[in-house]
Amino acid sequence: MAHTLLVAGTASHVGKSTVAAGLCRYLADCGVSVAPFKAQNMSNNARATPGGEVGVSQYVQARAAGVAPSTDHNPVLLKPRGDGESQLILDGDAVGHFEARGYYDEHWEDALETARAAHDRLAQSHDVIVAEGAGSIAEINLHDRDLANIETARFADADILLVADIERGGVFASLVGTLELVPDDIRKQVAGAVITKFRGDQSLLDPGIDAFEDRTGVPVLGVLPHDDPGLPEEDSVALPPVGERSVVGDDDAVPDAESVTVAVPRLPRISNFTDLQPLAHEPGVRVAYIPPDAALDDADAVVLPGSKNTVDDLRALTDAGFGDRLRSFDGPVVGLCGGYQMLGEAITNATIEGTGDADRVEGLGLLPVTTEFSESKTVEHVQRNIDGVGPLSGASGTVEGYEIHMGDSTLTGAAARPFDGDGAGTDTVLGTYLHDLFSNDTARDAFVRNTFESAGTVLPAATGRADGDPYERAAGLITDHVDLGPLGLSDQ
């Protein structure tokens, strides 16, 4: 039977996904048969596998482990769409939309059995399972139905590695409080703790570590420096709240002759914003998440991201006057998935996804496209030839990505089809259903080059990502800073 290690956290966004990915790559490099697992994930950043949708972190962890991503790695996925409802995905298939109470009353037992069965299948074919918890393992109001943490620890008989983030302050209070609040049987399964996002002289931290270990008997197995390996973010906790602006990427300097700003409206129900991360790693490129009512005066390009509720997010943009400002904008504009649908003339059957009563919702009107929603959902990995137009002018060859969407879009006027029949493009505007577009060098390089040319700025001499393989960087954080001996992983 496989050895399961549960990477649990004291809170959300403490680094669980990075630690899990690093462990997966480290073990794979050691020749260990390893697989990731997250019993239940709540995220709108999903990826397509042959069996259906999984959370992006488990997709990434599977790649780090050297195994094909599968719905067994994330058997239960909840995708929030707003107004307290989430779409439930079991074993990759969409079941329906539920409020929390409806999910627990109607589908909790199904979800538990689905997760157990997925873990059992993985345990039969791998030596180690690196399971990731969700949020905090100490949510005492949820301990009777905490699938990703408490239930996983129990049905997998997992050792637990507790992860805490020092950047937010109070790291020892978080660790001690978590250990005080978890059930007694779970407390006994905690094999060690890891502190993440540390800056400075670690010797100043050592007295606190000694006091924590004396008080709890739990060893601190490592202190990870504040070093982002560049893995995709799991959920919108990593983004600014709606209404606030935040910049990622080359943001150390004010805009100058060798930099451009790509503006991304921070949609209330944004999804798959990992599509933008490759741009943020380009020299001279800043990705600015802006409120829907923000001006576009300092933007050199605009990318409309995906949305879990395209109709309601379109209404939010329209109500904020974003459409008027976008139609007056003369730089490159790209819409991805839901963003592509918003750029069209209209969306019909809108009540299937939106929360309003209107069957037809007017789009932003930048592309001659109408979208009709239906109950069916497209989930697939795709490979397409690209004939770059507009913002992607100059791109050619083959691109890979994935589609996860409801609705089909139809051309209503003159526009190019840049991807083997998918998408629509004009001189300055392009839309596509293809997620992960900018992970393809030909598409990303063309977009960056065209954005610099449109802005009249100088393209930096250095192009492309220069910070190394993110999987190996994550593994390096583990091997360089964590004592794995007490976890028993070397015995596999």
From Swiss-Prot:
Which pathway does it operate in? Cofactor biosynthesis; adenosylcobalamin biosynthesis
Domain GATase cobBQ-type span(s) in chain numbering: 259-443
**Which InterPro entries would you find in this protein's record?**
Class_I_gatase-like, CobQ/CobB/MinD/ParA_Nub-bd_dom, CobQ_GATase1, CobQ_N, CobQ_synth, GATase_3, P-loop_NTPase
The cross-references to Pfam families, in alphabetical order and at most eight, read:
CbiA (PF01656), GATase_3 (PF07685)
Q: Which GO biological process categories is it annotated with?
A: cobalamin biosynthetic process
* Molecular functions (GO terms): ABC-type vitamin B12 transporter activity; catalytic activity
Question: Could you name the active-site residues?
Answer: C337 (nucleophile), H435
Say yes or no: keyword Methyltransferase present.
no
UniProt keyword terms in alphabetical order: Cobalamin biosynthesis, Glutamine amidotransferase
Q: Which residues form a coiled coil?
A: none
What family does the Swiss-Prot or TrEMBL record give for this protein? Answer: Belongs to the CobB/CobQ family. CobQ subfamily.
Write out the function statement from the record. Catalyzes amidations at positions B, D, E, and G on adenosylcobyrinic A,C-diamide. NH(2) groups are provided by glutamine, and one molecule of ATP is hydrogenolyzed for each amidation.
Q: Which NCBIfam families match?
A: cobQ, PRK00784.1
Q: What is the official name of this protein in its record?
A: Probable cobyric acid synthase
Q: Which organism is it from?
A: Haloarcula marismortui (strain ATCC 43049 / DSM 3752 / JCM 8966 / VKM B-1809) (Halobacterium marismortui)
Q: Which gene produces this protein? A: cobQ
